[in-house]
Amino acid sequence: MKKGKLIFITAVAVAVCMGIGFYVQKHGFTDATSVEIGISAGQALLMDADTGEVLYEKCADQKAYPASTTKIMTALVTLETMEEYDSPLEQKVRVPEVAEGVEGSSIYLKAGEEISVQDLLYGLMLVSGNDAAVALAEIIGGDQEHFVEMMNNRAAELGCSSTHFANPNGLFDED
C-alpha cells in the first residue's frame, strides 16, 4: 500500500514538473529578466544586497517626494549616532516643545515628557509618527536643520546622488 502511494505521488510530481516545463517553454520564458513585473507604484528598485546589481527598476531616476521613506533615514541616523556615542536606546530624553502637535500621523507627544529613544523609534517606524521624527531630530541633531544636514550627508555616503531631504519626517516640502 505504501509503495503504491509513493509511486502515485511521484508520478503526479513528475507530471506537474513536466507541465510547468512545457508552459514555460511555450510562453518563451528563458530567464527571470524576461518576466514582466506588475508593480503599481510610480517608482521601484530591486537590488541584490550582496552584489549591488540592480535587478529591476521602474522610473528610478524620476524625482519623487520621499514621504514616510524619509523616516527610514531618520531612524538610521539616530541609530548610528546612538551607537557612535555608545548611548543605550533605553536612554530617556525630554520631548522638545517643537515636537508637540506636529501635523499628520502622531504618537501624541507632550512637550517636556520623558520617553526613551527606543520608544521614539518605535513611534517613528510603527506609527509613522511625525512628532517622533521631529523629537529625534531635535535631540540627536540639536535642531532639525542640522539633523537634516546629517541625513543628507549620510545619503551621499550611501551613494544616493539624487536624494535630498528637507525635514526629518517626509511631510511635503517644495525642496
Predicted features, each with a name:
Residues 1-13:
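N-terminal Sec-pathway targeting helices
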Residues 14-25:
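Hydrophobic alpha-helical membrane-insertion segments, chiefly the h-region
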Residues 26-175:
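Active-site-adjacent loops and short helices of periplasmic peptidoglycan-processing enzymes
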